[in-house]
Amino acid sequence: MSGALLVAGTSSDAGKSVVVAGLCRLLARRGVRVAPFKAQNMSNNSAVTVEGGEIGRAQAIQARAAGLEPSVRFNPILLKPGSDRTSQLVIKGQVAESVTATSYVQHRDRLAALVLNELTCLRDEFDAVICEGAGSPAEINLRATDLANMGLARAADLAVILVGDIDRGGLLAHLFGTVAVLDPQDQALIAGFVVNKFRGDPALLQPGLRRLHDITGRPTYGVLPYADRLWLDAEDSLSVLAHRVVGAPDPPLGDDWLRVAAVRLPRISNSTDVEALACEPGVLVRWVSEPSDVADADLVVIPGSKATVADLSWLRERGLAAAITAHAAAGRPVLGICGGFQMLCRRIDDRVESGAGEVAGLGLLDADIAFHPAKTLRRWQRPLAGYEIHHGRVSRCAEHSWFDSDAEPQGLVRGAVFGTHWHGLLDNDDFRRAWLVRVADAAGRRFVPGDTDVAARRDAQLDLAADLLAAHLDVDAVLGLLDGPPPRPRLATRLCR
C-alpha cells in the first residue's frame, strides 16, 4: 500500500478532521505507516510540535491517531485569525508575519511549492498520507489561490472524498452543488461521497443516494451515524458555537454537580483546554457569553485568546468583566488560561498583537503583562505536561506561583483566582483532580473526583472513530483511492443526458 488521498468537506465542521483521524488510526492498527497532512489550516486551536513549532491542533490529534509525535511537516501553513481582516501567518511552525487576504495572495506561489514539497517528502517516507482539505472546495472565488483543496489535489493528483454533515439539513444539495460548481478538471478528482452524522435508519436515505449517484456518477462510500459520545479535540470556533454544553457529562460521584462557565470569547484559542474538565464525572461545562450565565457557576474559566486586548474589551462591553470580578470577590474560583490569564492581571502592555499600548486588566492578579515580538513556543513533559504559545510575558509579579515544573515556578494564584500560560495543564489527571477538589471546597460543593484518564480516553475516542469507519465505510474502496483518482464523468455531461 502506498499513496495519498484528500478528504474534503462541503463546509467547515463537516467531519473532515474526524474522518482523517479515523483513517489514520484504522491504518495504524493494520500496521500501515500513515501520516496526516493539512497544507493550510486556519485555526486558533494549535499545538506545539517536537521541533518547537506550532501546528493546528487537529493535525496534532491526527498524528496521535497515527502513532506519531506532532510535527510541523503535517501542517506547514497555519493562519491564526486575530481580527476579521488579519491573521498571523505561521510557516513550518514559526511566525512569519501578519497578513490580510490580499497580502497573503502574494505568497501563494512560494507557499504552494513549499506544501507540495512537504507532501512529496511525506509520501516518500510513509506508506499512506491522508490529507485534509480546508473549509469547502465550493468556495470557487478562492480557487485561483487555493493551497489546501482542489489546488493541492490537482498539483499532487489526489483522489478526493467529499464529506458532508447531514445533521444540518440539505446535504444532498450540498454534495451535488459542491461538485457542480467545480471546473471539469477539478470535478474529475472527486471520487465519491461520505455522509456524516446521520440519525435514524440508513435505508431511508438510499433513494436519495441512488439519485445522487445517477446525477453525479459517483458512489457514496459510507453513511456515518451521529455519534454523540465521540469526543475529539475541536478544530475551529464553529464547534464551540454549535454546542452550549461541552461533551456528555457523567453524573456526579459525590452529592453535587460542579458547574463550570467557560467564556466563549470572540477570538477564542485552544478552546480544547476545558474539555479535560468535561471528562470528569459530575462536572458540567457550559460555554457562556452573558453575565447572567456566570451567576450560578462554581468556576469561571476565561480561555485563551488570539486577541487578548480586543476580547478583554468585549468582556467589559458585555458586562462579563463586572460579573467575573464580582464572582471572584465572593471568593468563588476563576481560572484564566493564556490570554485569559493575561486578562486577569493588573496591566497589559501590548504593542505587538493589537498595538493598543498599555491597557488595564481585570486586576484579579497583581501582575503585569508585556507583549514581545518573539512568540514563546515550548513543550513541558515532567513532572507536569503542557505547552505554551504566547507573545505576552509576566513583567512584574507580586503573587505566589501556582505550581512548579522542572523546578521553575509556573502560573499565579491569589485566593481562588488562578492563572497560567500553560495549555494542556488540565490534561494532567492527578493535578486536575486535586485542583477540582480545591475548587469545589472554595465553591462550597461536595464533589468527588473520578479516575478519568484523559490520555487513555483520547486514545479510546480515536479507536471509536476508527471503529465507526470500519463499520460504516467501504474502507477497501476508499483505500483503493490512494493510487490516484479513478475516472469520473463530468457533471455537465451527465445532466445533459
UniProtKB/Swiss-Prot annotation:
UniProt-recorded name of the protein: Cobyric acid synthase
This protein's pathway: Cofactor biosynthesis; adenosylcobalamin biosynthesis
Family: Belongs to the CobB/CobQ family. CobQ subfamily.
A matching Pfam family: CbiA
HAMAP family: CobQ
Keyword Cytoplasm found: no
Residue span(s) of domain GATase cobBQ-type: 257-431
Active site, per annotation: 338 (nucleophile), 423
Origin superkingdom: Bacteria
GO biological process, one term: cobalamin biosynthetic process
Chain's role: Catalyzes amidations at positions B, D, E, and G on adenosylcobyrinic A,C-diamide. NH(2) groups are provided by glutamine, and one molecule of ATP is hydrogenolyzed for each amidation.
Gene assigned in the entry: cobQ
Alphabetic keyword roster: Cobalamin biosynthesis, Glutamine amidotransferase
GO function term, MF aspect, one: catalytic activity
